[in-house]
Structure formats: C-alpha cells, structure tokens
C-alpha cells in the first residue's frame, strides 16, 4: 500500500523545534500539526511554550487550542484529530509537518491501535498514581478510581496489586478507553512518517531550559496559573498536573516559597527533557540532528528533500 508521506520534527523541550520547523515549513509550503500534549489546551500559553503569532510567521498551525484546560484529552482523540488534519492539508495540495515532543502521540500515529501497549505511557501520570498509593488509604483510593472507569479490570485485581492498577489507570487517562477494552490488534498507519529528532549536548540543553523557565516567569507564568485557578480550572485536573503549572499551585497557596518553586520548575523540566530523549531513542529510522550546530538546518533540508538519515 502506497501511503502519503508526512514529516515529523521532534526533540526535547527547548531544543529549538519551533524556529527550525517554521523555517522548513516556509521553504516547502508546509502546514504544521502540533504534536504536544499540552499545547492542545486553550489559555495555557506561557507554560506550554506555545508558539506566538509572531513566531508562527504566517504558517498555519493545527492541533493547538483544541481543548479546554479542565477537559480530559486522550491519545486516541489526538490520533483521530491529527490524522484528519493531515488528510485535509494533503487534500489542499499542501504538506503536513508534525512538530512536538510528545512521544506517545508519535507512537500512536506510527502504530495505530497499539494504544494499550507501549504507545500509552506517561511517567508523570504514573508517578502521580504511584505517589497516591503511598498515602493513607492510597491503595483503596486507587482501586476505587479504577473501579469507576474500568470495573472489569478492577474486579480482577487484588487490592495490593498496585502496579497493575496504576498501569490500567495510566492507559485509561491516555487513551480514554478502559484497559479491559483496549484493542489487541495493531493496524497499519494511515500515513508514512519520516522522523527527525533534535538533540544537543546535555549541559547546553539544560542551560537553555533554565533560561526558558526564567523567560516564562518574566512573561507572566505565575499570573497565567493564577488566572486559570480563578476561572475555576481544578488544580488536580489533567492539564494542571503538567510541568510549569503543578509547581506554581503550591506557591500561590502559600505552601512553598519562590526559591523552592523556581528550583522545582527547572529540575522537573530537565527531568522531563531526559525522559523525552529516552522515549525518542526507542523510535526506529530517525535522523538525529544536533540543533546547536551551524549545519542543523541544512541537514534537515537534506532529510526533507532526499530522505537522508545519515
């Protein structure tokens, strides 16, 4: 089966995806499809490093601002909407360029229906659930949560089987489908995805991350979180558990000072970048590009036009 070709530019946070993707899109009449699990949310702009109108520079962007902050958004829903965007872009004679660092979104597109397996994994969700299990009556609360969304799996699991309960809840949060009803058969991807991943020296990346956090704070990150809470967005909803938001909430409640908050913002973002790179190394047939090098764009240009992986 001949499948239509799509290009994917991925990489950890602060690796330079936005600038390089805009340059590539302008050169090849591309429209960008966002592949970021946080930029889908409206009103969450600063903490998600959402590209500004100026940064977009006239390039159409899709899959940004498609959900409210208090709305649950599954990877299955992303897959369906992103594929519809790609098909529409191609139908208009343009090319789709997917850009973002959410690995399980890419996996779901490249391996459709494999949502109950490796494609559905998010360490931040897992860590949250595992922490809950350590609290008073945590195992019981975890089991009750599972029973509400997936009674069949809950009935099969012993109260002490925390690992499987966490896994089942993780899959449900990511896919919107109970673990017991996850499809078992993987189908062919609708499109062929050609992937390039940005990287750079770790110390340089971490320095860029710290500067980005400082810039976000200067741009009004604290005020953005305060505004979301004032509008009634629950502090414990999926979107507010994201890095850049969950650290600010205790600060606004007077439960931590700014020194600790700033430290956690930078530490958690560095850890997130490390997890992103770990995930991306699992992908096959990927061009790795050091975005700090002068020839980074030229390598991407060659990859785009010739399919070069060297």
In which residue ranges do the predicted regions lie?
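Phosphate/pyrophosphate-binding catalytic cores of soluble transferases and nucleic-acid-acting enzymes
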Residues: 1-310
């Amino acid at each position: 089966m001949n499948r239509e070709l799509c290009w994917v530019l991925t990489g950890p946070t602060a690796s330079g995806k936005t600038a390089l993707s805009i340059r590539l899109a302008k050169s090849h009449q591309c429209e960008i499809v966002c592949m970021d699990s946080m930029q889908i949310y409206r009103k969450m702009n600063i903490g998600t490093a959402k590209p500004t109108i100026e940064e977009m520079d006239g390039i159409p962007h899709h899959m940004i601002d498609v959900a409210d902050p208090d709305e649950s958004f599954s990877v299955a829903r992303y897959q369906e909407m992103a594929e519809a965007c790609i098909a529409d872009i191609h139908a208009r004679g343009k090319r789709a360029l997917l850009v973002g660092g959410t690995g399980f979104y890419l996996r779901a597109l490249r391996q459709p229906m494999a949502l109950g397996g490796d494609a559905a994994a998010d360490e931040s969700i897992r860590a949250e659930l595992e922490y809950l299990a350590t609290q008073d009556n945590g195992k019981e609360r975890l089991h009750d949560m599972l029973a509400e969304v997936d009674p069949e799996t809950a009935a099969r699991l012993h109260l002490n089987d925390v690992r499987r309960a966490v896994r089942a809840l993780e899959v449900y949060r990511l896919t919107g489908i109970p673990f017991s009803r996850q499809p078992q058969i993987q189908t062919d991807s609708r499109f062929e995805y050609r992937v390039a991943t940005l990287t750079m020296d770790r110390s340089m990346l971490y320095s860029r991350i710290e500067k980005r956090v400082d810039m976000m704070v200067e741009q009004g990150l604290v005020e953005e979180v305060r505004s979301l809470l004032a509008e009634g967005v629950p502090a414990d909803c999926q979107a507010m558990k994201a890095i850049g938001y969950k650290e600010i909430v205790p600060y606004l409640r007077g439960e931590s000072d700014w020194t600790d908050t700033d430290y956690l913002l930078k530490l958690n973002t560095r850890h997130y970048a490390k997890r992103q790179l770990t995930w991306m190394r699992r992908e096959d047939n990927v061009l790795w590009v050091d975005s700090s090098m002068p020839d980074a764009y030229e390598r991407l240009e060659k990859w785009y036009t010739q399919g070069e992986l060297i």
